[in-house]
Amino acid sequence: MRTIPPAVAVFLVLAGYASTPAAWGHRPIQAAENSQYRLVENWVHFPPEVTKWGQATGVDVDSHDNVFVFHRNELMPIMAFDTHGNFIRAWGRGMFKTTHFLRVDRSDAIWVTDRGYMEAFKFNREGTLLLTLGKQDVLGDNTSHDTFNGMADLAVTKNGDIFVADGEGPNTRVAKFAKDGAFIKWWGGKGTEPGQFNMPHSIAVDSRDRIYVADRSNNRVQMFDKDGKFLNQWTNVGVPWGLFIKGDLMYLVDGSDNNCLLVMSLKDGRILDKVTGLSNPTAVAVDSTGAIYVGEVNGTNVRKFIKTKS
């Protein structure tokens, strides 16, 4: 069993994996101009042990607007900060191989995915390990019940069901598990038809437990019900790397040539706002005030944006 070092105070940013630029593709985006959001400079206060971000692949917020980041730093890969950027704690030293996404569920449990070891981990806010999905360095296929080969991201529904985007690798599926980690089903397979995937890289769930999948190399977001039935797709999203849903809005980052953040209507997929000039954005999260946090890989940064006008 893996031993976790004691938690160390720090803000948590979730960092993500970047493939080669040639593989990212380019899909121009038509979007709203004159963004309502502005960058907040120097928003975070680092502890002495870590003075800058590593590649930031995962970020999310809890019910108290504390920010958690998963980034590529051996000493403090998971860091937590309060809404003012003050360091709280950190944990995970020596535990991960290739940090990827981070999610906070409705109970404020912290989930992270490791694309290297092909595992996902659930922690409480103090850093105690509660659950593991997958087996370290054991690779599965699309039909596997307890192993992965493309562990990318996950989402948790209101009843605790876990949906894993197992797609950054040979696998091309969404796998569904019960809250205790018991396998339920999978769907997908490689292809371009509705319900098929070509790198399902990120996954999110809305208030009605509908599942949204960033089908990255197919340049679309697909929507499903909780049983995997295809509902709809959006193709106006560029190359979707990371998704986050809050209320009736979807926040999507395109980490390829567009290097942007999109704010979209969940009702019809319309683009309402666009933030450009990012550097390989991979993860995005939004707090209760509407502040947006974006984790960048090439930029090795976690950027904070606030709304300046309605």
Regions found by a protein language model. Give the residues of each.
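Eukaryotic scaffold repeat domains enriched in small/polar residues
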Residues: 19-310
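Positively charged n-region of N-terminal signal peptides that target proteins for export
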Residues: 1-5
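Bacterial N-terminal signal peptides
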Residues: 7-17
